[in-house]
C-alpha cells in the first residue's frame, strides 16, 4: 500500500513539474511575441559612407550604441506592400542565428520615412572580392567560402517553417576580416511549410534574373531547390572569378536561353571534376535532380580535402577519419596514419600507446621518425591548455614534399628523418630568414628549404661569388627532384651529385632539426 502511495506522489510531482514548464514556455513565447524584434530609435543611429544597395534601400556604414554597424535605410517613398515586405525581413532576421548568417542587431520600424535595419558590419561582399584581380584568393580559400555560404543557406532550409532566400548571389554573401562568409539580404525571402511549393503572383518573379532558376523565371511552381540553382551559379563564379552572363542585355532573350535552350555558363577545363559535377547538379533544369544543401555541404567538404591534399590516398585517409574537420589531434592523427600505412592494426595497441608505454620503442628509429614528422606537421598550441593539432593543409604539404602515400607508405617517415639528418636542411623558413642565416658567410655556404612559392618544391639558397645570396628552385616533376635538367630520387642525392655544378660546399648551420636528431638517444614519449 505504501508503494502505491509513493507512486501516486511521484506522478503528482511529475505532473506539477510539467505544468510549471508549460507555463514557463507559454510565458517565454508570450514575451517574445510582445517584444518582437529589438527596436532601435532613429536618434541612436548615425550613417556614414555608402556600402551598397539592398533589396529595399541603401546600405551604409554607421554607428549605433557605440558600435560600428551596417545600416540598411529604406527608400523614403514606399507603398504599403514594400513596407510589409520590410517588416517581414525584420521579422525573419530577428529569428535566425547562425555563424554564417549576418547577425541582426535591431531595427527602426515605427517612424515613417526612417525605416532602418542594423546588422553587424562586414568587410565587403564576395562578388567584389572575386572580381578584383588584385585580391589573392587561393582555390582552397574560395572553396571554404563556398562551404560557409552553403552552411548558412542549409540553416535557412532546415528551419521549420522553411526559409527560401530567393535572391542568392555573390553580392548577397558578405565577408568578414577572417574571410568567413555570411548570408545577408532577406528582403525577398519567403516562408513555407516543408514539402509545400510556391508560385509568384501577378507582380512577376522576385529576385535578380541572372541568378534565378528556370522555374522562377517562367512563373512556375518552385521550392527551396530554386536556391540550389542559384548556388550553382555562385559556385561557378567562386571558381572562375568571372562576371556572370556578360553577353546578355535583353531579358526575354535571356529567359529563352536559360529555360528553352538550357544555357549555362561554360565551366573551364581546369575545374576539379568533383566541383564541376556539383555545379552541374545544382543548376540542373529539373529541380528534383538538384541536391539538397546538406548534400552540397558534404560534397564541398570532400572537394576542400581534395584541394588541401592532392595525394589520392592522403585524401582518402582524411575523408575516412576527419572529413568534417580542418584539423586533427596529433595523437589521433598518428594512430590513424600508423594503421593506414600498416605500422599497426586492429590487433595491436595504438601507435600513441606504443610510443608512450613500450620500452622497446624508447630511443628507436620509429620513435625518432615520429618526432621528425611531428616537427614539420604539427601546429603549436595557441594557448597553454590547447592540444597539438595537424592541419589538413600541412598534411597535404608534407605528402607533396616527401612522397606518395600509396607507393611509399611508412617509408615517408624514413625520408623525412633522412633529410633532417642533413645539416644543410632548414625546412620551412622564409626567403628573408634564409638570407639572414647566410649573410656574411663564405662563398659556397648553402642551405635547402621548402619553396615558399611552388607546391611540393624545394629551394637552394647559397652565397655566390660576389657575396650576394641567390636562390635556385628544386622542382619535383613526376616524383623526381630536378635542377639543371638533372633528376634524382631524393634531395640528398641531388645535393651530393650537383654540389660542384651549383657551387655549394659548406652547409649553413642553425637548422632546428639537428638538436632533434642528435639528442635521439635521450628521447622518450612524444609529448
Swiss-Prot record:
Subcellular location: Membrane
InterPro entries given in the database record: Kinase-like_dom_sf (IPR011009), Prot_kinase_dom (IPR000719), Protein_kinase_ATP_BS (IPR017441), Ser-Thr/Tyr_kinase_cat_dom (IPR001245), Ser/Thr_kinase_AS (IPR008271), Ser/Thr_Kinases-Pseudokinases (IPR051681), SH2 (IPR000980), SH2_dom_sf (IPR036860)
Enzyme Commission no: 2.7.11.1
Disruption outcome: Cells lack polarity, move very slowly, and exhibit an elevated and temporally extended chemoattractant-mediated activation of the kinase Akt/PKB.
Top-level EC class: transferase
Domain SH2 residue range list: 424-513
Protein kinase domain mapped to chain residues: 45-304
Transferase recorded as keyword: yes
GO biological process, one term: negative regulation of signal transduction
Catalytic activity annotation: L-seryl-[protein] + ATP = O-phospho-L-seryl-[protein] + ADP + H(+); L-threonyl-[protein] + ATP = O-phospho-L-threonyl-[protein] + ADP + H(+)
Superkingdom of origin organism: Eukaryota
UniProt keywords, alphabetically: ATP-binding, Kinase, Membrane, Nucleotide-binding, Serine/threonine-protein kinase, Transferase, Tyrosine-protein kinase
One Pfam family in the UniProt entry: SH2
SUPFAM superfamilies for the chain: Protein kinase-like (PK-like), SH2 domain
UniProt GO molecular function: ATP binding; protein serine kinase activity; protein serine/threonine kinase activity; protein tyrosine kinase activity
Active site residues of this protein: 167 (proton acceptor)
Binding-site residues for ATP, renumbered to this chain: 51-59, 72
Main localization of the protein described in the UniProt heading: membrane
GO CC annotation, single: membrane
Family: Belongs to the protein kinase superfamily. TKL Ser/Thr protein kinase family. SH2 domain-containing protein kinase subfamily.
PANTHER family, alphabetized: DUAL SPECIFICITY PROTEIN KINASE SHKA, SERINE/THREONINE-PROTEIN KINASE TNNI3K-RELATED
Function field: Required for proper chemotaxis and phagocytosis; proper spatiotemporal control of F-actin levels in chemotaxing cells. Negative regulator of the PI3K (phosphatidylinositol 3 kinase) pathway. Predominantly phosphorylates serines and threonines and tyrosines at a lower level.
Protein's name in the database: Dual specificity protein kinase shkA
Phylogenetic classification of the source organism: Eukaryota, Amoebozoa, Evosea, Eumycetozoa, Dictyostelia
Gene it is expressed from: shkA
Amino acid at each position: 500500500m505504501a508503494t502505491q502511495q509513493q507512486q501516486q506522489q511521484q506522478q503528482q510531482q511529475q505532473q506539477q513539474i510539467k505544468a510549471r514548464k508549460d507555463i514557463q514556455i507559454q510565458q517565454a513565447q508570450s514575451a517574445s511575441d510582445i517584444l518582437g524584434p529589438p527596436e532601435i530609435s532613429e536618434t541612436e543611429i548615425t550613417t556614414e559612407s555608402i556600402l551598397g544597395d539592398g533589396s529595399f534601400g541603401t546600405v551604409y556604414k554607421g554607428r549605433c550604441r557605440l558600435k560600428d554597424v551596417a545600416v540598411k535605410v529604406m527608400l523614403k517613398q514606399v507603398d504599403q506592400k514594400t513596407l510589409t515586405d520590410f517588416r517581414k525581413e525584420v521579422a525573419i532576421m530577428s529569428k535566425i542565428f547562425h555563424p554564417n548568417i549576418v547577425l541582426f542587431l535591431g531595427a527602426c520600424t515605427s517612424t515613417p520615412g526612417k525605416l532602418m535595419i542594423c546588422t553587424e558590419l562586414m568587410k565587403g561582399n564576395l562578388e567584389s572580392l572575386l572580381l578584383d584581380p588584385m585580391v589573392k584568393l587561393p582555390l582552397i580559400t574560395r572553396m571554404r567560402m563556398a562551404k560557409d555560404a552553403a552552411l548558412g543557406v542549409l540553416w535557412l532550409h532546415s528551419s521549420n517553417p522553411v526559409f527560401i532566400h530567393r535572391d542568392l548571389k555573390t553580392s548577397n554573401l558578405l565577408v568578414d576580416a577572417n574571410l568567413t562568409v555570411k548570408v545577408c539580404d532577406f528582403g525577398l525571402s519567403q516562408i513555407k511549410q516543408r514539402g509545400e511549393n510556391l508560385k509568384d503572383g501577378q507582380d512577376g518573379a522576385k529576385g535578380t534574373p541572372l541568378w534565378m532558376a528556370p522555374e522562377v523565371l517562367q512563373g512556375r511552381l518552385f521550392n527551396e531547390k530554386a536556391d540550389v540553382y542559384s548556388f550553382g551559379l555562385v559556385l561557378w563564379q567562386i571558381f572562375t572569378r568571372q562576371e556572370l552572363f556578360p553577353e546578355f542585355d535583353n531579358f526575354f532573350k535571356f529567359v529563352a536561353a536559360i529555360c528553352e535552350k538550357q544555357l549555362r555558363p561554360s565551366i573551364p577545363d581546369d575545374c576539379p571534376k568533383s566541383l564541376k559535377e556539383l555545379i552541374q547538379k545544382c543548376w540542373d533544369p529539373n529541380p528534383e535532380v538538384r541536391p539538397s544543401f546538406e548534400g552540397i555541404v558534404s560534397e564541398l567538404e570532400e572537394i576542400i580535402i581534395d584541394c588541401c591534399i592532392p595525394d589520392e590516398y592522403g585524401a582518402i585517409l582524411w575523408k575516412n577519419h576527419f572529413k568534417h574537420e580542418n584539423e586533427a589531434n596529433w595523437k589521433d592523427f598518428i594512430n590513424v596514419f600508423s594503421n593506414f600505412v600498416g605500422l599497426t592494426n586492429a590487433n595491436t595497441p595504438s601507435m600513441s600507446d606504443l610510443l608512450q608505454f613500450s620500452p622497446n620503442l624508447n630511443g628507436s628509429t620509429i620513435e625518432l621518425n615520429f618526432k621528425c614528422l611531428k616537427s614539420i606537421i604539427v601546429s603549436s598550441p595557441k594557448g597553454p591548455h590547447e592540444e597539438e593539432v595537424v592541419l589538413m593543409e600541412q598534411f597535404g604539404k608534407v605528402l607533396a614534399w616527401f612522397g606518395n602515400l600509396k607507393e611509399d607508405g611508412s617509408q615517408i617517415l624514413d625520408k623525412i628523418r633522412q633529410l633532417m639528418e642533413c645539416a644543410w636542411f632548414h625546412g620551412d623558413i622564409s626567403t628573408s630568414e634564409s638570407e639572414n642565416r647566410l649573410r656574411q658567410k663564405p662563398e659556397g655556404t648553402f642551405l635547402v628549404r621548402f619553396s615558399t612559392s611552388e607546391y611540393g618544391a624545394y629551394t637552394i639558397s647559397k652565397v655566390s661569388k660576389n657575396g650576394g645570396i641567390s636562390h635556385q628552385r628544386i622542382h619535383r616533376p613526376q616524383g623526381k627532384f630536378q635542377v639543371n635538367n638533372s633528376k634524382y630520387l631524393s634531395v640528398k642525392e641531388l645535393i651530393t651529385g650537383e654540389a660542384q655544378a651549383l657551387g655549394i660546399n659548406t652547409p649553413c648551420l642553425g637548422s632546428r632539426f639537428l638538436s632533434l636528431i642528435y639528442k635521439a638517444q635521450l628521447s622518450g614519449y612524444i609529448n
